[in-house]
Amino acid sequence: MTARLALVITALFFASCTSESTPPPNGAPAPGQEVASSLSRDTAPDTTADELARLTADNAAFGWELYRELVKDRENLFFSPHSISVALAMTWAGARGNTETEMADALRFSLGQARLHPAFNALDLELASRAEAGGANPPLPFRLNVTNALFGQRDFTFLDPFLDTLAIHYGAGLRLMDFVNEAEQSRVAINSWVADQTEDRIEELIAQGIIDAATRLVLVNAIYFTASWAEPFDEANTRSDPFTLPDGTEINTPTMHGNAAMRYVDAENYEAAEVPYDGQQLAMLLIVPDEGQFAAVESALAASTLAQILDELSVHQVDLSLPKFSFRSLVPAKEPLRSLGMVDAFGGAADLSGMNGTGGLFIQDVVHQGFIAVDEKGTEAAAATAVIVGETSAPPAATLTVDRPFMFAIIDRPTGATLFIGRVVDPSN
């Protein structure tokens, strides 16, 4: 089976508190030109193992708190707390005063400015190395690409220290746009860049009307992930099986069937299994509440409970039945972030003076979009046995039939980074 695609885009829009603007000066760089810091990305950041562990723990805490805000009035959901954290960390580099404090509290940043950005750089570089760990001939080449970019008003001055921080720790350059006179053309150009980064899976991230003449900066983070399972599902075994919705309605949905060694637990009110991807570095954690327990299990999910679930898992030989699913989530993140305490950044009280030296900037909006597709396309993946190294006897058998709503997370095993979080209430939607 191939977990074909998981990709997420986060975009933030920054506006001036005044819509007044002067025409671009003679000799100003042309729209579309990239103005980069003179400094190169640091490929060997000075980060300790403890700092990296704190960062991934903080991001997980933020991710599950944001999850609780996002699932309100939703069925299926897919988003990347990592993508949102990276985009807002780049923003935080320019935040000062109470805006800086509120953002750190909402995002659960426990590292200060001097240590957070090198830690994000170290994590990004660590994730970039994952493609080297795949099998010899997977049905789908492993890809985990994280890309950052800034699009700024061509006649607006951004401070060199701000641009240096983003270049050194995030590899992000500044592409110049003319939001004042060409807002719609700028929107189309940014959407085109996003489409290029996501193999055309996300073509319309920014809707009409979001960018206007007051926009001064658009900051974008993209994550593109595609991989094969370590153990394949046989397409011939896929069949239409029943799946029970929260209201008790039973539908039939294409369901894959396979048997493989994986870490599994049958807990008090849920079952969980960690299904590894090719190379064994990343895995999808399935959390399947018992019948009637979905709300209780979901409401208890947090970084600490996720760690507890992972700690409880042990290797079993699992008969796994998993629905195929594919959906897109458009996540307006502004109000959920407000609910988490990030208030000043979105209005006149914002202090983003670290970006331009004078302030007068605020975040117009935060747009986040994710797409995931899981199916059994492709040929058989290279079998891996890393999960059973050290076992001296056959692991116990277990059966996990995912025939009811479930949550999932895609986790980088060596660092513990939670890259994606989602839930499937209706796999046919």
What is each PLM-predicted segment?
Residues L219, E271-I287, P395-N429:
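Extended hydrophobic
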Residues P81, R108, P289-E291, P323, ...:
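Proline-rich low-complexity regions
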Residues A30, R74, G112-E291, D311-P396:
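Non-catalytic, conformational "gating/processing" segments within enzyme and secreted inhibitor domains
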Residues T99-A104, Q293-V297, S329-P332, A382, ...:
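Extracytoplasmic/secreted cell-surface and envelope-processing proteins
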Residues A303-L306, L337:
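C-terminal, non-catalytic macromolecule-binding modules
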Residues T2, I9-V180, R413, V424:
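Detector for small/aliphatic-rich hydrophobic stretches
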Residues T101-L107, F233-P242, A295-S304:
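Short Gly/aromatic-enriched secondary-structure transition segments
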